[in-house]
Each structure stands twice: as C-alpha cells, then as structure tokens.
C-alpha cells in the first residue's frame, strides 16, 4: 500500500510557502499571527535558510 505522505519540496513550497501565504488575505493573517507569536520560522520555506 502506498503511504499518504510522499514528500516533495516543490509542492510543499507552492502550497505552504511564503509567497503562497502572501497571495491570500487568510494567508497574510496567518503570517501576522506567527509574527505576533514570535515564531522563528514563519513558513515552511524558511526552513532551508541559514540565519
């Protein structure tokens, strides 16, 4: 049986990445909430970046 999670970096970034979040009003609200909470990673696309 095929497992449900078949990881793909491209699909993940397109669906949950920073630019995808910025496209919609709801996505921008998510980013605002995560900034207010003080998250070091706002979106999944931040995981690859070295600070």
Curated annotation (Swiss-Prot):
Gene3D superfamilies: 1.10.287.3980
PROSITE patterns the UniProt entry points to: RIBOSOMAL_L34 (PS00784)
Keyword Transport among UniProt keywords: no
Pfam name, any one: Ribosomal_L34
Gene Ontology CC terms: ribonucleoprotein complex; ribosome
InterPro entries in the cross-refs: Ribosomal_bL34, Ribosomal_bL34_CS
Gene Ontology BP terms: translation
Recorded superkingdom: Bacteria
MF (Gene Ontology): structural constituent of ribosome
Record family assignment: Belongs to the bacterial ribosomal protein bL34 family.
Full protein name: Large ribosomal subunit protein bL34
Organism encoding this protein: Borrelia hermsii (strain HS1 / DAH)
Lineage: Bacteria, Pseudomonadati, Spirochaetota, Spirochaetia, Spirochaetales
């Amino acid at each position: 049986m095929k497992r449900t999670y078949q990881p793909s970096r491209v699909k993940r970034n397109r669906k949950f990445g920073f630019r995808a979040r910025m496209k919609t009003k709801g996505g921008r609200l998510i980013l605002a909430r995560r900034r207010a909470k003080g998250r070091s990673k706002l979106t999944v696309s931040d995981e690859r970046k070295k600070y």
